Design a protein with these regions (language model features):
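Acidic, Mg2+-coordinating active-site environments of NTP-dependent enzymes
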Residues: 129, 133, 148-214
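ATP-dependent carboxylate-amine ligase catalytic core
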Residues: 23-27, 32-35, 60-146, 162-164, ...
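Hydrophobic/aromatic ligand-binding patch that stacks against planar heteroaromatic rings
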Residues: 57, 123, 144, 177, ...
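Short functional linear segments
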Residues: 1-43, 50-52, 56-63, 68, ...
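Class I S-adenosyl-L-methionine
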Residues: 8, 59, 100, 198, ...
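Short active-site-proximal "capping" loops at secondary-structure junctions
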Residues: 45-47, 72-73
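Glycine- and other small-residue-rich loops at beta-strand/loop junctions that grip anionic moieties
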Residues: 43, 113, 185-188
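Aromatic/hydrophobic pocket-lining residues that form π-stacking "cages" and hydrophobic walls in ligand
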Residues: 54, 120, 197
Length: 214
C-alpha cells in the first residue's frame, strides 16, 4: 500500500495522547529502526525555526542532517527536510516500503503523527543527525520514545490545554519531563518554568544549560 493511501486512512487531528501505544510499537520494532543521533525540539513557540537553524548549522559543518517537523502547510513531504531539500514522493515511498516491511499490519494501527514519526527514521536513515520537532507536549509525544542525545526547549506557554494541562505549570511539566541527559532551554521563560526545568534536571541528573541568545 502506498504512503498516500495510508495517510488517507488517518486523521491529522489529535484527539488524545496515547501514553503507551507508541512506546510499545517502538519496543517491538526498535532493532529494525535506523540508528541516528537525535536532537529533540520541544516548546510552544519557535520549534520549527529553531530546528531549521540547527539543521542548517550542522549541514554547513558537513553533516548529513534530517529535520522532521509538523504540521505541513501544503504537502506531507514538507515534514521531511533532508540535507537542504524537501523529501520527494519517491523517497517517501521507498521509506514507506521499508517501514511497512518491518511493521506489516501494525502500520495501519499508527496514528497520522505516529506513522509520520516512524517514517522519518527510514527517510533519514543515512543521516548523522536527526532533528525531531515534538508534536504535542513532550513526555508522551511520539518523538520522545526514541533515544534523544540532546533536548532543546524553546519558549513554553499555553497550548493544547485540553491535552496537556489547564495551567502553565502542568503544561511545562509534561514538556520538560522529556528532558534528555543534555539539554538547553531558552532563557525567555516564566521564572516558574525555569525553576521547574532546573528541578527536573536535578532529578534526572541532566546537564541543563540556559541560553542567553534571543
Amino acid at each position: 500500500m502506498k504512503f498516500q493511501q495510508i495517510l488517507s486512512q488517518k486523521t491529522m487531528h489529535v484527539q488524545k495522547i496515547s501514553r503507551f501505544f507508541m512506546f510499545s510499537m517502538y519496543e517491538k520494532y526498535k532493532k529494525f529502526i535506523p540508528k541516528t543521533k537525535n536532537i529533540q525540539i520541544i516548546g510552544t513557540n519557535g520549534k520549527g525555526s529553531t530546528g531549521r537553524f540547527l539543521a542548517l548549522l550542522l549541514l554547513e559543518q558537513g553533516c548529513k542532517v534530517g529535520h522532521y517537523t509538523s504540521p505541513h502547510i501544503f504537502e506531507f513531504n514538507e515534514r521531511f527536510w533532508l540535507n537542504g531539500k524537501i523529501a520527494s514522493n519517491e523517497l517517501l515511498e521507498k521509506a514507506h516500503e521499508e517501514l511497512e516491511s518491518v511493521f506489516l499490519d501494525d502500520v495501519k494501527k499508527l496514528s497520522y503523527f505516529e506513522y509520520a514519526t516512524f517514517l522519518a527514521f527510514f527517510v533519514f536513515k543515512d543521516c548523522d543527525y536527526v532533528i525531531l520537532e515534538a508534536g504535542v507536549g513532550g513526555e508522551y509525544d511520539a518523538t520522545s520514545v526514541f533515544e534523544i542525545d540532546f533536548s532543546v526547549f524553546t519558549k513554553i506557554g499555553f497550548d493544547h490545554q485540553d491535552l496537556l494541562g489547564k495551567n502553565l505549570e502542568e503544561i511545562a511539566r509534561t514538556k520538560l519531563k522529556a528532558m534528555s541527559a543534555k539539554a538547553l532551554i531558552n532563557h525567555k521563560q516564566e521564572v516558574k518554568v525555569l525553576n521547574l526545568a532546573q528541578k527536573i534536571a536535578n532529578l534526572k541528573q541532566a546537564s541543563l544549560n540556559i541560553s542567553s541568545l534571543d
